[in-house]
Regions:
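Predominantly extracellular beta-rich ligand-binding scaffolds that present long acidic/polar faces
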Residues: 6, 11-177
Length: 177
């Protein structure tokens, strides 16, 4: 099943995406959870294109399990992430005897990430990374939001996507061609 800019996706977040694609999705929700927690999706196995999250994310640790938290996605397995960004702060509370991976963009990553950006309280964009990625921190000096928008739009155009970012305020927003 694919979510393409639907009301459900814009108002809420995806708990676990097992297949399909999420495209043209945004979330400003404050998200709290206990296992895999992210601004748009807690766990993602399908593709994600042209999505962003601006709300804060909190991983509430109270488990011996392996846990992950990220500004966009907590656990990123499966298919690709293309032209997405996250700006909400990512924090954690508690402790675990398992592995805990937290990143400003993704908690755990096992797939290709292209032309993606983050700007929040984390220097590290990906908590645990098992792939070559293009996830870059917007620092306002060398990497600005305008440079990020240009790179994300180039990647979207190359992929044949009808989505584009615009920078008319402090943060980029999406529009469909």
């Amino acid at each position: 099943r694919s979510l393409v800019g639907s009301e459900m996706c814009i108002r809420d977040r995806v708990g676990a995406q097992k297949a399909g694609s999420i495209t043209g999705c945004s979330s400003s929700a404050t998200v709290k959870g206990t296992v895999d927690v992210g601004g748009v999706a807690g766990e993602k196995w399908g593709s994600m294109t042209a999505c962003y999250a601006t709300g804060n994310v909190t991983l509430e640790i109270d488990s011996p399990k392996n846990l992950s938290g990220g500004g966009l996605v907590g656990f990123n397995g499966g298919s690709s992430v293309l032209a997405c960004y996250a700006t909400g702060n990512v924090t954690s509370t508690g402790s675990s005897t398992g592995n805990v991976h937290i990143g400003g963009f993704l908690g755990d990553n096992y797939t290709t990430v292209t032309a993606c950006y983050w700007k929040n309280n984390h220097e590290q964009g990906i908590g645990y990374n098992n792939k070559v990625t293009e996830a870059t921190k917007v620092d306002g000096t060398d990497v600005t939001w305008q440079k990020a928008v240009d790179a994300m739009n180039t990647a979207l155009q190359t992929a044949g996507s009808k989505w584009r970012y615009e920078l008319n305020g402090a943060l980029p927003t999406l529009r469909k061609l």
